[in-house]
């Protein structure tokens, strides 16, 4: 990786979108074939809008993953960081249990997690047929959180690459 003529930004974007594209293809298949055809569950909203929101979520989630990778020195340490951070993010985002049943402090802390916004906007699009005019705030917040994690991860990754080249 260090001898390739790529910048840390290009390496990170390739990592995010290579995996993200595979996930988006899987999500599209699951919604069109499994949900609509096999299970006969109608989707109320726009599939392209949902996929665009899912792409933004994948960017945010992958940015958190890369950030955690810059904090850890080994794969076992990274695994422990994932257990301590990603699992609570998923459990407290509103997808497993309603956010309204959580203490206000937890609800406020979870506003720093992109999963919270994605759960809200995915439910709005898929269940209620919401359009961009309804979900844009959640989409902007989710993308902003992802951009913050991406920026910090990029700075840390650049520093790590620079230190290993010296």
Model-based region annotation:
Residues 21, 32, 41-166:
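Membrane-spanning alpha-helical segments of multipass transporters and channels
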Residues 4, 14-15, 155:
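Structural detector for helix-capping/boundary residues
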Residues 9-26, 49, 141:
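Alpha-helical transmembrane segments of multi-pass membrane proteins
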Residues 28-35:
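Membrane-embedded alpha-helical segments in integral membrane proteins
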Residues 1-8:
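Short helix-to-coil transition segments within interhelical loops
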Residues 2, 37, 126:
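Short polybasic/polar patches that bind polyanions
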């Amino acid at each position: 990786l260090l001898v390739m003529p790529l910048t840390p930004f290009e390496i990170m974007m390739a990592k995010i979108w290579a995996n993200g594209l595979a996930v988006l293809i899987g999500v599209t298949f699951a919604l069109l074939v499994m949900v609509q055809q096999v299970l006969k569950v109608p989707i109320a909203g726009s599939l392209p809008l949902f996929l665009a929101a899912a792409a933004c979520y994948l960017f945010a989630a992958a940015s958190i993953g890369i950030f955690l990778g810059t904090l850890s020195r080994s794969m076992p340490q990274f695994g422990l960081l994932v257990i301590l951070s990603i699992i609570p993010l998923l459990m407290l985002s509103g997808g497993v249990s309603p956010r309204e049943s959580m203490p206000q402090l937890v609800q406020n802390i979870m506003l720093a997690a992109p999963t919270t916004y994605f759960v809200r906007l995915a439910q709005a699009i898929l269940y209620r047929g919401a359009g961009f005019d309804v979900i844009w705030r959640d989409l902007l917040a989710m993308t902003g959180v992802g951009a913050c994690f991406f920026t910090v991860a990029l700075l840390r990754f650049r520093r790590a690459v620079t230190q290993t080249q010296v």
